[in-house]
């Protein structure tokens, strides 16, 4: 039984919407994970790490990668070790800090990431194929309002 099915009709609409969003996210993410595994023999965390590095051609320090991916340093180290072994990323010493290094995509890693990213885009487009362009725009706009409100609430709480 998915999260949404557990909500009863007496629950507020906002709660039922939240559960629907979670369910949709879980279903789409599961599909993406399955496709990455079957087509590229990789995982979503590896794809995410490579995606972060693609956006930073000079590479990123491990702590910055960890922060951007919202995972522990140990997780980033484990994934990085695998990708280094496969020749998809490389470690580079950080000038002025003998204990730190940056990680960046190798040319081979960049080529593979571009292939995966194109497929990823296709999978996401397919996930929303049941909606018209207008519906996608409306949903994007509405979720933008939710995002802005949530962000503002969070900022108000941390002041």
Question: Predicted segment positions?
Answer:
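Alpha-helical linker/hinge and terminal dimerization helices associated
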Residues: 28, 32-35, 69, 112, ...
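N-terminal helix-turn-helix DNA-binding core of bacterial DNA-binding proteins
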Residues: 26, 30-72, 86, 154-159
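Residues within helix-turn-helix
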Residues: 62-63, 74, 81, 101
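N-terminal leader segment of winged-helix/HTH proteins
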Residues: 1-40
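Charged, amphipathic alpha-helical coiled-coil/dimerization segments
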Residues: 2-6, 81-141
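C-terminal regulatory/oligomerization modules of transcriptional regulators
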Residues: 1-11, 133-159
